[in-house]
């Protein structure tokens, strides 16, 4: 899977995070893995704010799937 670095804005906090997104053909969605643990008890929505330059994909952090269109359109996403 080709990775795309993304900048994430968590809508319920002052925190920002960076992460990697990759298209998952089985689910027809984007698999996102964050650098941090900002998907907490209250974090239910995020905005894919932009792409960014980063180094290696994270080895830890939160992981979830979102619709592929969310990254293209940079729209708000409600987490499952």
Regions found by a protein language model. Give the residues of each.
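Conserved RNA-binding domains used in RNP assembly and mRNA/RNA metabolism
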Residues: 1-80
């Amino acid at each position: 899977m080709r990775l795309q670095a993304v900048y994430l804005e968590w809508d319920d906090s002052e925190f920002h995070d960076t992460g990697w997104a990759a298209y998952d053909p089985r689910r027809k969605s984007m698999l996102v893995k964050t650098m941090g643990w900002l998907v907490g008890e209250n974090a239910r929505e995020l905005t894919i704010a932009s792409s960014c330059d980063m180094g290696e994909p994270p080895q830890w952090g939160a992981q979830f799937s979102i619709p592929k269109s969310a990254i293209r359109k940079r729209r708000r996403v409600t987490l499952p």
